[in-house]
Amino acid sequence: MAHKKGVGSTRNGRDSESKRLGCKKFGGETVKAGNIIYRQRGTQIHPGTNVGCGKDYTLFALIDGVVKFERLGRDRKKVSVYPAN
């Protein structure tokens, strides 16, 4: 057994709190206006029809409806909310 702590061990032992990013509502789910759909850093997914974008790039529903993830060109994605019929 070591009688000294070892060089690294006293400098370790920290970790940042998780930011809880990612998808909060999936395709086909019904949402109400104001519901958060996606939390992200930067625009991984762009806002589509009836979806707003917050200052931290959080995507949220502007109307009640159904979530649909779509392609925006060849290399981008967008999320839209369409009214549920």
Swiss-Prot record:
PROSITE patterns: RIBOSOMAL_L27. Keywords: Ribonucleoprotein, Ribosomal protein. HAMAP family: Ribosomal_bL27 (MF_00539). The keyword Ribosomal protein applies. It comes from the Bacteria. This is Large ribosomal subunit protein bL27. InterPro entries: Ribosomal_bL27, Ribosomal_bL27_CS. One of its GO terms (cellular component) is cytosolic large ribosomal subunit. Disulfide bonds: none annotated. GO terms for biological process: translation. PANTHER family: LARGE RIBOSOMAL SUBUNIT PROTEIN BL27M, RIBOSOMAL PROTEIN L27. NCBIfam families: L27. It comes from Geobacter sulfurreducens (strain ATCC 51573 / DSM 12127 / PCA). Belongs to the bacterial ribosomal protein bL27 family. It holds the Pfam family Ribosomal_L27. GO terms for molecular function: structural constituent of ribosome.
